[in-house]
């Protein structure tokens, strides 16, 4: 696996000093970040909206949907799931379909094969490798055979920007996750800028697009 140097002063993964993503304080932090700096003045989400829409993902299950930033850009009847009930409530207040894991399991229209695609954006870096594998194992059956899987993670500056990021997940790690889950990789790419920009631009992303076995 690729070796990413530890950030001085960052919390050690898995220790009590690592902030939680499950509480109301994390939801409030996400809401503040939505309105911070240049985001108040410019349509900074436009490139990322275009990137998702050009993939033509159909009905999407968005794992770790947060406040619905990506869910807003997904197809009709797409659904988000998040372990943070406060974030789920915010999504619903925005008119989005979102559930906690228990709520999703009980939803009549979210059974096996009911989604065209699975989106796992800015989630894998928040959890240990085994937990990430379990998430994929749990939710992949909800995607129809031949459907798409999109996994997105931050590059260097973005990784360092959040103390809840506990694990570096680059192209190599994404491919390993795909292989273990039986996902056929169609392509990987850096977005919105070429790979070297990840060392200076906080919103550069690793993207893997794959296919669920038929």
Please give the residue ranges for each predicted region.
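A short glycine-rich, Lys/Arg-flanked "PGG" loop and its adjoining helix->strand segment in the class I
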Residues: 133-145
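Conserved N-terminal segment of class I S-adenosyl-L-methionine
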Residues: 1-119, 133-136, 189, 203-207
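Short catalytic micro-motifs in class I SAM-dependent methyltransferases
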Residues: 122-126
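Conserved beta-strand signature within the Rossmann-like core of class I S-adenosyl-L-methionine
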Residues: 146-154
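Short "lid" loop at the C-terminus of a central beta-strand within the Rossmann-like core
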Residues: 154-159, 193
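Conserved S-adenosyl-L-methionine
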Residues: 183-195
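Core SAM-dependent methyltransferase catalytic element
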Residues: 194-214
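Acceptor-substrate binding/catalytic loop of class I
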Residues: 158-173
């Amino acid at each position: 696996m690729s070796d990413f140097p530890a950030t001085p002063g960052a919390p050690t993964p898995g220790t009590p000093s690592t902030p939680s993503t499950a509480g109301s304080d994390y939801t409030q932090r996400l809401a503040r970040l939505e309105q911070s700096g240049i985001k108040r003045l410019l349509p900074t989400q436009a490139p990322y909206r275009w990137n998702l829409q050009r993939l033509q993902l159909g009905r999407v299950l968005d794992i770790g949907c947060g406040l619905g930033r990506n869910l807003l850009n997904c197809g009709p009847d797409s659904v988000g799931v998040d372990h943070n009930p406060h974030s789920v409530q915010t999504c619903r207040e925005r008119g989005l379909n979102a559930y906690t894991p228990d709520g999703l399991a009980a939803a009549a229209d979210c059974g096996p094969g009911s989604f065209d695609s699975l989106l796992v954006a800015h989630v894998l870096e928040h959890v240990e490798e085994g937990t990430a594998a379990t998430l994929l194992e749990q939710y992949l059956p909800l995607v129809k055979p031949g459907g798409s899987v999109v996994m997105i993670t931050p590059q260097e500056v973005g990784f360092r920007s959040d103390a809840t990021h506990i694990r570096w997940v680059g192209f190599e790690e994404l491919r390993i996750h795909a292989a273990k889950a039986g996902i056929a990789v169609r392509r990987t790419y850096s977005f919105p800028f070429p790979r070297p920009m990840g060392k200076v631009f906080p919103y550069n992303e690793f993207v893997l697009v794959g296919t669920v076995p038929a």
